[in-house]
Amino acid sequence: MSQPESLPFIADFPLKPHNTFGFDVRARLACRIETDAQLLAALRDPRAAGLRRLVLGGGSNVVLTGDFDGLVLLVALRGRKVVREDDEAWYVEAAAGENWHEFVSWTLAEGMPGLENLALIPGTVGAAPIQNIGAYGLEMCERFASLRAVELATGKLVELGAGACRFGYRDSFFKQEGRERFVIVSVTFRLPKVWAPRAGYTDIARQLAAVGLGDATPTPQAIFDAVVAVRRAKLPDPFVLGNAGSFFKNPVVESAQFDALAAKEPEIVSYRQADGRVKLAAGWLIDRCGWKGRTLGAAGVHERQALVLVNRGGASGTEVLALAKAIQQDVAQRFGVELEAEPVCL
């Protein structure tokens, strides 16, 4: 990495523009990170000594429940390139501050498909491994090669492979033991040269059929376009209505528990997993409990997608968490299923 350089710290920094819920909270200190050297300088600056650090990219997967008494690192690292290729795949590196959707679009434009099912997911490249983002039959970990990160406590640069990242369903090492310990600076993806479409989800298949591709093998661009169309139809724009996308993970239950649920609820939406367990559609469970479109204080459940909690104007992070807890209690009482929140709550 480059040698440290000085950079401005901003006191009493407003975080409302930097979280997609639009919570009106502030940080004690903040600085914008555009280079490796600036990151090192921020970590070593005596003004931030002893302060808690929070890394923000797009702010699309965080619930801020109050002012942050520490240093916020606004990651704006840019750059994307093919670092190598072999007979089987391209290896593409992107800096952590790159917009995720724009990166996916770029890989397609460069003739390197493989990420199209993850189009239009909000946030940055650096946030993708933390959450192990996924949608419509693909998880990021399936295209992951490695990442570079800086340890907050020491400023040491490390390179981590998939094993060290311990990816799970919307989970990783960075949400568990590694939480608040690292700043991801770049991610390298492995995009296979032998491509096969993943168009099995009903919404995607229906959208492809609507544009005359129901019986044809879709191209990567066609799947990209279908995913974008479906997401825009179902999910609110966070710049218009504050939200963090899907708020709850789809719960996975044992086969016996699913059979008992299906006997009582024959219309339950489910997806059989390779290990025999069954993934349930959290949105369906929430809708069945009557929460779709409801409001609690200034927080609410979106009218078209029950998985999405929204800020209807002036809501606090505490109000959103209170709404989430009420939903979790109702789902647990009716179905005996525990819903887990996707965003990081601070």
From Swiss-Prot:
Origin superkingdom: Bacteria
Q: Give the matching PROSITE patterns.
A: FAD_PCMH (PS51387)
Instruction: Report keywords, A-Z.
Output: Cell cycle, Cell division, Cell shape, Cell wall biogenesis/degradation, Cytoplasm, FAD, Flavoprotein, NADP, Oxidoreductase, Peptidoglycan synthesis
Q: Which InterPro entries match?
A: FAD-bd_PCMH, FAD-bd_PCMH-like_sf, FAD-bd_PCMH_sub1, FAD-bd_PCMH_sub2, MurB, MurB_C, MurB_C_sf, Oxid_FAD_bind_N
Q: Which GO terms describe its molecular function?
A: FAD binding; UDP-N-acetylmuramate dehydrogenase activity
Example of a GO biological process term: regulation of cell shape
Q: List the disulfide bonds.
A: none
Which parts of the sequence belong to the FAD-binding PCMH-type domain? 23-194
Q: Where in the cell is it found?
A: Cytoplasm
Q: Which reaction does it catalyse?
A: UDP-N-acetyl-alpha-D-muramate + NADP(+) = UDP-N-acetyl-3-O-(1-carboxyvinyl)-alpha-D-glucosamine + NADPH + H(+)
UniProt-listed Enzyme Commission number(s): 1.3.1.98
What pathway does the annotation place this protein in? Cell wall biogenesis; peptidoglycan biosynthesis
**What is one cellular component GO term in this UniProt entry?**
cytosol
Active site feature:
R170, S246 (proton donor), E342
* Record carries keyword Cell division: yes
**Which parts pass through the membrane?**
none
What function is annotated for this protein? Answer: Cell wall formation.
The family assignment reads:
Belongs to the MurB family.
Task: Tell me the PANTHER family matching this sequence.
Answer: UDP-N-ACETYLENOLPYRUVOYLGLUCOSAMINE REDUCTASE
Q: Supply the name of the protein.
A: UDP-N-acetylenolpyruvoylglucosamine reductase
